[in-house]
Amino acid sequence: IKGQDSMFAKTALPLYFNSLSAAKASNDYTKPAEILSLIRAYQKKHGSEVLPSDSKISAEIAYNKINIFNRLFRYFTLFGVLMFIGIIIQIFKEGPLVNGFVKVCKIVIWSFFVAMTLGLIARWYISGHAPWTDAYESIIYVAWATVFFGLAFGRKSDLTVASTAFVAAIILWVANQNWLDPAISTLVPVLDSYWLMIHVAVIVASYGPFTLGMILGVTVLILMILTNGANKAKMDLNIKELTTINELALTVGLVMLTIGNFLGGQWANESWGRYWGWDPKETWALISIMIYAFVIHMRLVPGLRGKWIYNVASIAAYGSIMMTYFGVNFYLTGLHSYASGDVPVTPSFVYYLVAFLVVLAIISYVFYRKHYIKKG
């Protein structure tokens, strides 16, 4: 840029801010508006290739006003809890009113999934790249994948849909904490690859089935605690159903995680000239694969068979996914930690959540022994 263009680039902003100060005193904003229009014309002349179009600007303004993912965590919480309460009432006393209520909740949760999908499409259109490139986007993508698999596996299981809605609310709540930046930004150069569409989409989406398996494990333990002599037959049927769906979810998740890991090796070879380098993300992805392979095959070990131990294992195994994602991105140094850019933090609720799960496992085992283990 030479001559007048160079001078304009150097002086435009200081001149604009000075004119704003003067306009504030005189209440006449004609001059700042003129300078702003000149800046806009200059940007279009020299930066038209990178400037967003008017339609994208309008779309981003609408997206920010709607703030769909911030709203959805509240909606998912409300209808997930309401649906779960309705299902518990169904177990004890079924009737047309409660059946209709549960069906309405299920339809509403489906509509929330459509809204999530539209929100991701909007981010994709506005940014010009796949919406799973930073910490915030990857979390909302995990939430989307969790709801997708929850609705797919729970077509005939209302408890699965209710559990999915509840865990989606938790994920979206985490995404909207102040230590994550929801701003739509440009793509990090190392992610500017077609592998973003393939590797990242597959491996991050695999966290969805694992998350579903975790929340189904929690739901099964709660059902065990709610079991009594009068409802044992219905509870046993629901526990078997959720455990079967849990096994299916973990199997799908393991397949996706394994495929995603191999695809990551291909990308690593193109980017860094090696397929495997024991980077923290690579290592923990491998650890997660081994842990979930063990959990899925526990039923083949006589001493590790049983619905209680399987569901507890599906909850505990999720810790490896948390380490693979949050631990590596926020705490460890490696080639994959560029994606976060945030200050490492361990929210206090994590410790309370772990304590709650331990207590839940212990109490549920007492009821499991009482109602489901045959006494010899």
Where are these regions (language model features)?
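Cytosolic-side membrane-insertion boundary helix
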Residues: 51-81
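Soluble extramembrane regions of membrane proteins in the secretory/endomembrane system
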Residues: 1-62
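Interhelical loops and loop-helix junctions of multi-pass membrane transporters/channels
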Residues: 188-192
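Hydrophobic cores of alpha-helical transmembrane segments in multi-pass integral membrane proteins
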Residues: 69-94, 102-129, 133-185, 195-225, ...
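Solvent-exposed interhelical
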Residues: 97
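Membrane-interface interhelical connector segments
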Residues: 226-242
